[in-house]
Amino acid sequence: MTKTRQETDTMGKMDVDASRYWGAQTERSIHNFPIGRDTFVWGRPVIRALGILKKGAAQANAELGELPADVADLIVKAADEVIAGKLDEHFPLVVFQTGSGTQSNMNANEVISNRAIELAGGEMGSKKPVHPNDHVNRGQSSNDTFPTAMHIAVVLELNERLYGAVGKLRDTLHAKAEQYKDLVKVGRTHLQDATPITLGQEIGGWVAQLDYALSEVKHAGEGLLDLAIGGTAVGTGLNAHPKFGDLAAKKYEEETGYHFRSAENKFAALSAHDALVQTSAALRTLAGALMKMANDVRWLASGPRNGIGEITIPENEPGSSIMPGKVNPTQSEAMTMVATRVFGNDATVAFAGSQGNFQLNVFKPVMVHAVLESIRLISDACLAFNDHCAVGIQPNEAKIKENLDKNLMQVTALNRHIGYDKAAAIAKKAHKEGTSLKDAALALGYVTEDEFAQWVVPLGMTHN
């Protein structure tokens, strides 16, 4: 039988597993919200952010004379363990709880309180010498702490995970674009043949999309540096020292290296999460760029004998349980599925962000979960696509030449010399009779052989 201890809150007593640091409110949440427990338990980013939040709050309160130094020191030591990931198993709650994140805020308060009590040699559950509300939550409300943790978590994940992962893929593609900048191939619009481009130009388009999308994410991320801390329950700062918000934000900057600041308008910081909505929208843009790239790659690699086949990609695993020897563009397929998930997450965030009522938005947990999932999926997908696909992209030069030689849209180069109508007649004749453009042009007498050779130069048509 599991050994228990009694914990109390304002609603009474609760039996808690004696090996766990959480208290009565967390235990109630475990019983009241058994929703997606195997899938939607908070991960490292939010738990770490809660630790950073509580550590900085204790330091700020101590400097302002709101907490005894010895109590603050105990809180800081316990919070450091939360930040380091040593207490993750003591954060059992799921995303789907109260929309302000109150249960998760109290989970952090209770865990830090009991661990601090243990460090002091006290009795867990006694709330002495460190009380979860009076000390760990001093000058705070769930309404300002949880959105603060949301922003801290997302900023850290963007900087420590996403930017590097996307940048790695971007750099690989940029190198490929430079490598193949003079390799001329068929361009395509409307899924039909178009005028020539180089393979480098095609890949360079993907690079430019990633550059733009990443710049948009970084711009949106700047808004996440504004924190709700100091607003307490409704944005007025009731029960917090007037300097608490600014000082706490400074402590978060010292802990993380990112320039966090207490938001100028706390009412908006509690009741709306526009910076998170904007960040999600930018992630959606990034996912769209990755979707386009992945689709282009699998189309260009289609075949091997009856598709476009202008590039080859690494053969990573068997592609069929019934067709021997078949190999599929699996990294592209994984990337496109990630993109659709990010699109769905953004729809969740956009709707949830619009649902603030009066002084509070109560969709906070699902918003930050969706954004963090998008960041993680995009990051992992970019690394996988880079390592198992992009680095191995190679041109199939024979197929590229074959397709280019058959491309009727090279006739566009004749427009300025013989006019659109005559050029169109050449293309139609060549297509109808299955001949080359050159043969059709000479047969119609619109150009000489020397003129055709001078005017129809594929590389020159790329303006490379």
Swiss-Prot record:
Gene3D superfamilies: Fumarase/aspartase (C-terminal domain), Fumarase/aspartase (Central domain), Fumarase/aspartase (N-terminal domain). The keyword Phosphoprotein does not apply. This is Fumarate hydratase class II. It comes from Deinococcus radiodurans (strain ATCC 13939 / DSM 20539 / JCM 16871 / CCUG 27074 / LMG 4051 / NBRC 15346 / NCIMB 9279 / VKM B-1422 / R1). GO terms for molecular function: fumarate hydratase activity. Its EC number is 4.2.1.2. GO terms for biological process: fumarate metabolic process; malate metabolic process; tricarboxylic acid cycle. It comes from the Bacteria. There are 2 substrate-binding sites: the catalytic A site, and the non-catalytic B site that may play a role in the transfer of substrate or product between the active site and the solvent. Alternatively, the B site may bind allosteric effectors. It catalyses: (S)-malate = fumarate + H2O. Involved in the TCA cycle. Catalyzes the stereospecific interconversion of fumarate to L-malate. Keywords: Cytoplasm, Lyase, Tricarboxylic acid cycle. Substrate binds at residues 100-102, 131-134, 141-143, 189, 321, 326-328. The keyword Mitochondrion does not apply.
